[in-house]
A protein has these predicted regions:
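Long, charge-rich, low-complexity alpha-helical segments
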Residues: 2-15, 47-116
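Alpha-helical membrane-targeting segments
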Residues: 31, 35-55
Length: 116
């Protein structure tokens, strides 16, 4: 667990290896979550129409942040890029950015930390 703000801003994330996603022409990311629970497979076999993937479309800001995550950029660098592109619309910047990154790391497992 990082001890201070500087350590938090130096965290580097990468997209999880097993995550599937699509990017459209407007740079909007759609996460594809495979639905392969045994109950879902069973109902598909008896011809229920259950999609194999759940599609989650991110908004403009989330998509921009997600596409910045490359295993090299720090949280601080991603924040600076976000502020350069969107200006005051993203303030309070790091509070919102860290909340989003924590959510897609801890709750969704879309990304993972590459450094401690």
């Amino acid at each position: 667990m990082p001890n201070n703000n500087e350590e938090v801003l130096n965290i580097i994330f990468k997209i999880s290896d097993n995550l599937e996603y699509e990017v459209d022409e407007d740079s909007i990311v759609t996460i594809l979550e495979k639905q392969d629970h045994k109950i879902q497979k069973f109902f598909r076999k008896i011809k229920f129409r259950i999609p194999e993937y759940k599609k989650i479309t991110l908004d403009e800001y989330s998509s921009y942040v997600f596409l910045q995550i490359d295993g090299k950029k720090t949280v601080k660098a991603i924040g600076e890029n976000l502020e350069a592109k969107y200006g005051d619309k993203v303030n309070p910047l790091y509070e919102r950015l860290l909340l989003f990154l924590n959510h897609i790391d801890v709750n969704c497992h879309y990304i993972e930390k590459t450094n401690s």
